Amino acid sequence: MANQEKVEAVALLKGKLEEKNNFILACYSGLTVEEITGLRAQLRKEGSEMKVLKNNLFLRALKESGAHKDKNISFGPEYQGPLAAIFAKDNLPTVAKVCKDFAKVNKNLIVRAGYMDGSVLDANGVEAIAGLPSREQLLAMIAGGINAPARTIASGINQIVASLARAIQATAEKNNA
């Protein structure tokens, strides 16, 4: 790769890192083109994207990008070989779940690491995040939790009114008899 191409590749990766500052690193060795295309389509549905990397260029882009500049991120020996970065904005748990589900079917996709909100994650950390509910599910849970006490109070008030109505009805029937 010529020097100018490397500079352009680093600039492209820096742009991706600043736009979508969370990512997962995965080894894709052994996947067919069709399998990679299928994974990319699933990731696109979640607003994410997958880029095949040159490891040294990605490390350089990490060190130069704004959000990751002060972080001590490096590739150990477990990160050697063909890697792809799967970029995500706010939905890394959902993207991690897509990768986990894909890896169950295609054993050649191996998640190596991840980065979420300033924290470097190992493969186990990414797998743990895949088990978290999505942002939408969390919001629904919060809304349900907020709504539950109001629903209980409304039900209690309705029961009091219904009991009062039954008591008035019983008194009216007793007086008429």
UniProtKB/Swiss-Prot annotation:
Family: Belongs to the universal ribosomal protein uL10 family.
Subunit relationships: Part of the ribosomal stalk of the 50S ribosomal subunit. The N-terminus interacts with L11 and the large rRNA to form the base of the stalk. The C-terminus forms an elongated spine to which L12 dimers bind in a sequential fashion forming a multimeric L10(L12)X complex.
Domain of life: Bacteria
HAMAP family (UniProt xref): Ribosomal_uL10 (MF_00362)
Protein name: Large ribosomal subunit protein uL10
Pfam entry (one): Ribosomal_L10
Gene name per UniProt: rplJ
Keyword Protease: no
Gene Ontology CC terms, in alphabetical order: ribonucleoprotein complex; ribosome
